[in-house]
């Protein structure tokens, strides 16, 4: 709606969405659902024929550090160390600094990869397990993110995902901007 109020045509908006958004979904069915939802949302504003760049690919296998994104919004998979295969554990240990020690969760690698995919001044908002702020094995991750962390929105106690009991929070991050204060908000 904002782009329309600025006088941009539906065609121009559709082209911009096609060129400036990239997404990753490893599950083909979920990828298709994502595109359908995006199309429905755009249709509400009269925007059609967006050629979505939603890749059916593992984000961690993509050369994300080459993206230099302005914004990253995500909800990484919540897979515990216990639920990973030995092959997955070894891959993450070899490729991600925050996964070299202890019993890391899969989402730690996503957070590191996303930070590396940001350009300087780029911002990230991730919906993450709240346990990251308490878990002993998340210490390396906390060290990694603390410099650019701008805020935490604590959703503990909220039923964010139907049928799933997991306390979550939004992590707000800005690359290259060290903060002496971090916004903390409870919902």
Question: Language-model segments: which ranges?
Answer:
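Conserved SAM-binding loop of SAM-dependent methyltransferases across substrates and taxa
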Residues: 1-16
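Signature of N6-adenine DNA methyltransferases within the class I
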Residues: 4, 26-35, 45, 49-51, ...
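Short basic/glycine-enriched coil/helix segment immediately N-terminal to the Walker B
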Residues: 12-18, 65-68
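Short Gly/Ser/Thr- and Asp/Glu-enriched loop/turn motifs at secondary-structure junctions
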Residues: 16-19, 49-51
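Conserved SAM-binding motif I beta-strand of class I
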Residues: 20-25
């Amino acid at each position: 709606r904002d782009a329309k109020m600025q006088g941009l045509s539906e065609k121009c908006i559709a082209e911009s969405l096609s060129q400036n958004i990239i997404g990753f979904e490893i599950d083909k069915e979920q990828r298709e659902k994502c595109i359908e939802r995006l199309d429905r949302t755009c249709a509400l504003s009269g925007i059609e024929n967006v050629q979505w760049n939603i890749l059916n690919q593992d984000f961690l296998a993509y050369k994300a550090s080459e993206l230099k994104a302005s914004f990253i919004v995500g909800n990484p998979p919540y897979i515990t160390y216990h639920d990973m295969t030995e092959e997955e554990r070894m891959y993450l240990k070899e490729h991600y600094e925050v996964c070299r020690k202890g019993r890391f969760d899969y989402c730690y690698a996503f957070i590191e990869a996303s930070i590396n995919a940001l350009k300087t001044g780029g911002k990230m908002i991730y919906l993450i397990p709240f346990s990251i702020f308490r878990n002993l094995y998340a210490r390396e991750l906390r060290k990694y993110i603390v410099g650019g962390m701008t805020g935490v929105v604590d959703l503990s106690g909220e039923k964010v995902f139907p049928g799933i009991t997991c306390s979550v929070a939004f992590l707000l991050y800005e690359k290259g901007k060290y903060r002496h204060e971090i916004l903390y908000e409870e919902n």
